Amino acid sequence: MKKILIIGKKSFLGSNLKIFLSKFYKVDKFSFEEVLKKKSFFFKNFSHVINTSIHKNYVNSKYNAKFDLDKIFLSKFEKVDFYYIFLNSRKIYFPKNNIKENSKISPIDNYGKNKFLTEKFLKKKLKNKLISLRISNVLGTRIYKNLRNNHKLFFDNFLEYKRNNKEISFNDDFKDFITIKQFSNIISKIIKLEVTGIYNVSLGKKIYVSEIVKWLDQNLYKKIKFTDSSKDSFTLSNKKLLRKIKINITKNQVKSFCKSLIK
């Protein structure tokens, strides 16, 4: 039976993945600080390691290796025997429609630049043990509330707007959203099939901001002025990954998930 190590005890992705993956695999979850204290032999029993922890300076500042937690962790090992799932970002690309894995790399901010630099290091270090996932926007709720969050979610921003209860305006860009359920299922299939390589993880379809707000809360939707825009619009092609794992993810699944979040 495959055994999974998740690094990032209380992160959004880590805590949700722990619940989902535990249905199919043996899963352990530790904080980044805890795994750094472990000796190399501790990791021999794990088939896959997923790092979901991140330093706030890695998100907001220019690249500095002392804030690159993936590099710090993997530098513990002379030889890596487990598969390493690197949670990359769609921000390594310039926003446009139908971005493929071989599209030009053109990071839009420091976070995107830092992720690409880390990916380059991991490709050299891990070779065929690397799974680098260039992820679109993941929708879902945090299991652990009121904690230090180094990376704001779309749903965090939505709840903030909802609490303010004011009339606001949004650019009605289209985005590529994927739910935490869809994302977790994709990770499970990648583990089961021992997929390796670089892949976009996305719905692969346009969802306009106005659509998703309406699915989440029709009352809030009525208070927002939406302006046509394509400045920050993007979708990621997911065909390469779906050919490997053969699952069906749909826009209707995203719609149903959104409606279940606000009750």
What residues fall within each predicted segment?
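NAD(P)H-binding glycine-rich loop region in Rossmannoid oxidoreductase-like domains
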Residues: 35-75, 90-92, 96
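N-terminal Rossmann NAD(P)H-binding glycine-rich loop of SDR-like oxidoreductase domains
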Residues: 2-23
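Active-site helix of classical SDR
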Residues: 110, 114
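Conserved Rossmann-fold NAD(P)-dependent oxidoreductase catalytic core, especially the SDR/UDP-sugar
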Residues: 72-108, 131
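Mid/C-terminal beta-alpha module of Rossmann-like enzyme folds, strongest
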Residues: 184-232
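Alpha-helical substrate-binding/gating segment
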Residues: 155-168, 173-200
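Conserved C-terminal active-site "lid" loop/helix of NAD(P)H-dependent oxidoreductases
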Residues: 180, 208-214, 225-263
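NAD(P)-dependent short-chain dehydrogenase/reductase
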Residues: 120-174
